[in-house]
């Protein structure tokens, strides 16, 4: 979904971020009022948005130069002095702007482009001195009492600093939000974000970190280029906090009783097998040879992205086959198989007839034209089959564990489920899902603690903010850059 300002070519090509934000506010406010904004002036806009008048004046001048807004000076009728200056949209009845409603995340987008004072707690500010948490707890094993954010005995809990969302951060968050799905997940590259916001890439990177620090980006999966993937380049993915203003969906966390047995993800195991195979240590390797050939020698960030893709595939299975996943019977999903092939098998390049060896023409007629990016060739189908099997294993793991809440009927209510990736070094000790709609028996935020094998109790937390920051990081509920985590003494 494009924001309003994106539909005006002169704004996208010539205006800076402040002017883009201002135009979106003017159009959105007009839609809210069901009429053109009357007496639109520098002073009224500055007051409405709590901005400096100089910023508003400069932005309106940009919009005037782009022929999007016209400057109107009221006649003085013989009186001395300058007439009152107001501004009006001059877009006319542009069909591109006829539909002025946000189809998704409307409440949050309307709040971003309004005079609402959007203030959020800065993550980590409650820790006091940097490194305080890291020094106080070396183990990450779950302890309910330690995990709840409560003041130490004899001390008052710090309120923590608050961060006000600037107009440029609002614009960036809105651009991300406008392209996200129902769960707030969006895949977009830095160059595209820079183009849409009118900012430089480095400025966008800095502001993305700010959004993370304010808890508005729950999870960031960095993009990368690798021959492993068919597209060659996978853009970054973000899970946005769509509940920042008002609850939109629901979250459930499952914490296992088998702490050591669930310490690794499928990608962790694959990476270990690849390292051992490369070193010639073949004993105990579980990964299929085709996957080893695909992933061997790849850096850790490729395995992290591979795990994210597996979780996307598993989310599809959980949403479509919840009941079937309860048994060990094979599940055939042609849509998922096609999805995996698109992600891992490159499309064939058309060759000129003169470039094809005549002796090979007949032999190629019945063969698949696509090859894996690593050149695995005829093993492409086998490799994709292995990836399909891994996704099925993950889906069944999540089905078993969340199915322990046997008072909840995911199938009957046709829940749409999305796995929220947790910390890469936390394994499956705690797993998190987003789901819509809300389900009977689970609140907006639910924590299932496995007290013994197969038996869970539901926690009393009303929101993820009741956990300390390390737990929220572990569960995938918030994310911070590595440097920030290190400075705060977090893992």
Task: Describe these PLM feature segments.
Residues 85, 96-98, 174:
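Intrinsically disordered, low-complexity N-terminal extensions of nucleic-acid-metabolism proteins
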Residues 31-34, 42:
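Extended, helix-rich scaffolding/adaptor regions
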Residues 1-16, 32-33, 90-163:
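Positively charged, structured surface patches that bind polyanionic biopolymers
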């Amino acid at each position: 979904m494009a924001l309003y300002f994106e539909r005006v070519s002169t704004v996208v090509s010539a205006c800076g971020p402040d002017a883009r934000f201002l135009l979106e506010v003017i159009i959105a406010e007009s839609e809210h009022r069901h009429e053109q904004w009357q007496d639109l002036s520098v002073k009224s806009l500055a007051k409405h948005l709590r901005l400096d008048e100089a910023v508003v004046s400069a932005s309106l001048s940009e919009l005037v130069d782009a022929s999007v807004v016209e400057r109107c000076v009221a006649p003085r009728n013989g009186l001395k002095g300058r007439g009152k200056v107001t501004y009006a949209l001059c877009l006319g009845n542009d069909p591109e702007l006829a539909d002025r409603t946000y189809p998704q995340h409307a409440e949050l987008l309307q709040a971003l482009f309004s005079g609402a004072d959007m203030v959020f707690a800065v993550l980590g500010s409650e820790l006091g001195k940097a490194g305080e948490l890291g020094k106080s707890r070396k183990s990450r094993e779950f302890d309910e009492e330690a995990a709840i954010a409560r003041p130490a005995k004899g001390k008052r809990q710090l309120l923590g600093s608050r961060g006000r969302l600037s107009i440029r951060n609002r614009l960036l968050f809105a651009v991300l939000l406008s392209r996200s799905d129902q769960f707030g997940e969006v895949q977009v590259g830095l160059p595209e974000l820079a183009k849409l916001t009118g900012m430089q890439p480095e400025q966008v990177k800095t502001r993305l970190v700010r959004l993370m620090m304010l808890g508005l980006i729950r999870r960031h999966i960095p993009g990368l280029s690798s021959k492993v993937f068919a597209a060659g380049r996978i853009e970054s993915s973000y899970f946005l906090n769509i509940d920042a203003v008002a609850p939109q969906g629901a979250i459930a966390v499952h914490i296992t009783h088998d702490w050591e047995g669930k310490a690794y993800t499928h990608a962790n195991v694959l990476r270990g097998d690849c390292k051992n195979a490369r070193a010639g240590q073949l004993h105990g390797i579980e990964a299929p040879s085709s996957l080893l050939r695909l992933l061997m020698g790849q850096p850790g960030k490729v395995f992290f992205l591979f795990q994210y893709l597996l979780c996307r595939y598993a989310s599809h299975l959980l949403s479509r086959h919840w009941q079937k996943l309860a048994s060990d019977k094979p599940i055939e999903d042609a849509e998922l198989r096609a999805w995996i092939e698109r992600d891992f098998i490159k499309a064939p390049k058309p060759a000129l007839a003169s470039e094809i060896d005549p002796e090979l023409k007949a032999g190629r007629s019945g063969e698949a034209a696509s090859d894996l990016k690593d050149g695995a060739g005829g093993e492409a189908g086998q490799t994709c089959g292995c990836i399909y099997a891994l996704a099925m294993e993950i889906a069944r793991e999540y089905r078993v564990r969340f199915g322990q809440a046997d008072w909840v009927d995911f199938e009957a209510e046709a829940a749409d489920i999305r796995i929220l990736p947790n910390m890469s070094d936390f394994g499956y000790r705690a797993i998190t899902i987003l789901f819509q709609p809300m389900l009977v028996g689970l609140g907006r935020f639910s924590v299932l603690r496995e007290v013994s094998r197969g038996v869970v109790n539901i926690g009393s937390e009303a929101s993820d903010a009741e956990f300390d920051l390390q737990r929220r990081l572990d569960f995938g509920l918030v994310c911070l850059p590595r440097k920030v985590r290190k400075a705060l003494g977090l893992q």
